[in-house]
């Protein structure tokens, strides 16, 4: 961090200039800034989130969803930058006023100099914002007919000041959008209510809001929006099973960066500095790059995120990672398999060369990609369409090679409807390059199909209890616990590679965990009598309905 010595030197050489600048400060701007520092009474509730969404959703009358999504998320991001700036500013002010702090000074001019020095912000991962880029400047000019241009200009200033972090991150679409100053006023005034306080850190508040809006846009857009968004319960489950700590994490289909967020949150829960985790991501969609970068910056993190096709232009070809995570496109077809060269290093499992996956389905190209990028002592966890568990032909040959090389250490069959508007059943795969001796030749299968909470007609989620139940089984397996304690009929089973081979190298958990039959203590004869009586009632009811329909048709002359 910068020190007072630097500023004492600056003060001696430039005191007159600083005095002139201080006179230019208006009481109005100071008051505006002060009002944005914090609101200790602020509380982020589901009701408040819903209010924000209703405000944003009114734009749907003027713009398509895929357009106004970026208008809204961009404004939330700009609001977050300002709040984080003022949050850090308040921290500096407290240090300057604290006699026990190294920054303590009673010199008002020196205090002003320090408050405007960007080193004191950047050292804590906070961007120093020029006045024209702060939210309060937007508020002051909110009724200006060129407010859209003011916002775009602010974005350009930030890009020029921080090209490595912000170049092409925030869409400059505000001047060209069909929204007028009244629309922007409506949004800006409502988003101004989002604040922070001692109990509500900026990155927590805005991280939650950003995630909430991503989820809501996914609901509205359906499958189109879903390609950017992996349900939070799934990203958390995978990150927890992998037990992500420090090191490197890579997502080659990063979408909006959900896996990175879950990893960062896990580190913070465990008291680990988030800077201990190096983040790498790739996606073929430029908008995914923007969403991920904004998602990370809001949370005070940075990442090496690149744009291109992971199949054919792997931007991290020479790198392996401690953790590989992903939710790739399911059953992607026409992916130009013919462009994969025979000597592609991804087409090798151990000492065995495997064929190129079929052009009609890229699932196994993704799996090979994940394995290739997993470090020798690393782990991978990813979402995959259920078809990959049992696919035959070339895919079956690749799966056999993966299993025989003892790379799979866990498979979880997921409950239905975890993805909004996507009914395709999915499973989670977990890969390890090097297993401990007690795990070698074994795979943990978990059937979690009935482990869910329904939150709407279209969507289910995994609760914290569900996630813990699954993670606990993996912890037992990885710690060498007795298999009799791990195995649970109908839910979990540690199977050997020999067992899997006897099942044709199929990885469907249901093949191994068995079926749990509940005994309610009622004798079979009693049950059959009840069922027979119920069936007779239903058949009688059917006959009555048939006669009723016939009467109606006769009356109508049919």
UniProtKB/Swiss-Prot annotation:
Alphabetized SUPFAM superfamilies for the sequence: S-adenosyl-L-methionine-dependent methyltransferases
Binding locations of S-adenosyl-L-methionine: 227-232, 256-258, 283
Region named Disordered: 1-37
Any GO BP annotation: DNA restriction-modification system
Compositional bias segments (type: Basic residues): 19-28
Organism annotation: Methanocaldococcus jannaschii (strain ATCC 43067 / DSM 2661 / JAL-1 / JCM 10045 / NBRC 100440)
Any one GO molecular function term: DNA binding
Miscellaneous notes: Type I restriction and modification enzymes are complex, multifunctional systems which require ATP, S-adenosyl methionine and Mg(2+) as cofactors and, in addition to their endonucleolytic and methylase activities, are potent DNA-dependent ATPases.
Keyword ATP-binding: no
Subunit structure: The type I restriction/modification system is composed of three polypeptides R, M and S.
Domain of life: Archaea
Role, per record: The subtype gamma methyltransferase (M) subunit of a type I restriction enzyme. In the presence of the R subunit the complex can also act as an endonuclease, binding to the same target sequence but cutting the DNA some distance from this site. Whether the DNA is cut or modified depends on the methylation state of the target sequence. When the target site is unmodified, the DNA is cut.
Catalytic activity: a 2'-deoxyadenosine in DNA + S-adenosyl-L-methionine = an N(6)-methyl-2'-deoxyadenosine in DNA + S-adenosyl-L-homocysteine + H(+)
Keywords: DNA-binding, Methyltransferase, Plasmid, Restriction system, S-adenosyl-L-methionine, Transferase
DNA-binding keyword on record: yes
Protein name per its UniProtKB record: Type I restriction enzyme MjaIX methylase subunit
């Amino acid at each position: 961090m910068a020190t007072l010595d630097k500023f004492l030197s600056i003060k001696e050489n430039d005191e007159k200039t600083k005095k002139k600048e201080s006179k230019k400060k208006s009481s109005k701007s100071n008051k505006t800034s002060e009002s944005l520092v914090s609101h200790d009474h602020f509380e982020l509730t589901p009701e408040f989130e819903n209010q924000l969404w209703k405000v944003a959703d009114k734009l749907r009358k003027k713009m398509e969803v895929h357009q106004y999504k970026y208008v809204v998320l961009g404004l939330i991001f700009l609001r977050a930058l300002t709040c984080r700036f003022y949050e850090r500013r308040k921290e500096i002010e407290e240090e300057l006023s604290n006699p026990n702090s190294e920054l303590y000074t009673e010199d008002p001019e020196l205090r002003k100099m320090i408050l405007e020095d960007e080193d004191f912000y950047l050292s804590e991962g906070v961007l120093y914002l020029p006045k024209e880029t702060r939210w309060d400047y937007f508020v002051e000019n909110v009724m200006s007919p060129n407010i859209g241009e003011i916002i775009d200009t602010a974005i350009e200033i930030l890009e020029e000041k921080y090209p490595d972090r912000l170049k092409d991150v925030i869409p400059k679409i505000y001047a060209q959008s069909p929204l007028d100053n009244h629309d922007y006023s409506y949004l800006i005034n409502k988003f101004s209510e989002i604040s922070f306080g001692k109990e509500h850190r900026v990155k927590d508040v805005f991280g939650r809001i950003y995630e909430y809006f991503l989820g809501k846009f996914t609901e509205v857009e359906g499958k189109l929006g879903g390609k950017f968004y992996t349900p939070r319960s799934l990203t958390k489950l995978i990150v927890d099973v992998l037990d992500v700590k420090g090191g490197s994490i890579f997502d080659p289909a990063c979408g909006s960066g959900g896996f990175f967020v879950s990893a960062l949150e896990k580190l913070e829960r465990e008291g680990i500095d988030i800077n201990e985790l190096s983040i790498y991501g790739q996606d073929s969609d430029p908008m995914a790059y923007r969403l991920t970068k904004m998602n990370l910056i809001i949370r005070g993190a940075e990442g090496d995120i690149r744009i291109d096709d992971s199949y054919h232009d792997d931007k991290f070809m020479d790198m392996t990672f401690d953790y590989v995570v992903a939710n790739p496109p399911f059953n992607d077809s026409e992916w130009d398999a013919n462009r994969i060269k025979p000597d592609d290093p991804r087409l090798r499992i151990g000492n065995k060369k495997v064929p190129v996956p079929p052009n009609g389905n890229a699932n196994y190209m993704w799996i090979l990609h994940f394995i290739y990028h997993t470090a020798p002592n690393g782990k991978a966890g990813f979402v995959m369409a259920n078809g990959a568990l049992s696919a035959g032909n070339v895919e079956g040959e690749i799966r056999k090679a993966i299993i025989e090389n003892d790379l799979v250490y866990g498979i979880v069959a997921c409950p239905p409807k975890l993805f909004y508007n996507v009914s395709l059943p999915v499973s989670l795969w977990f890969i390890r390059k090097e297993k401990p001796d007690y795990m070698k030749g074994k795979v943990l299968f978990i059937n979690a199909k009935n482990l869910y909470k329904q939150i709407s007609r279209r969507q289910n989620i995994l609760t914290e209890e569900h996630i813990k139940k699954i993670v606990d089984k993996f912890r037992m397996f990885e710690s060498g616990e007795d298999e009799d304690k791990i195995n649970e009929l109908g839910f979990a089973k540690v199977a050997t590679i020999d067992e899997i081979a006897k099942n044709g190298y199929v990885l469907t958990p249901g093949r191994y965990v068995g079926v749990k039959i509940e005994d309610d203590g009622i004798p079979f004869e009693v049950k059959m009598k009840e069922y027979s009586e119920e069936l007779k009632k239903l058949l009688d009811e059917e006959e009555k309905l048939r006669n009723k329909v016939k009467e109606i048709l006769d009356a109508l002359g049919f």
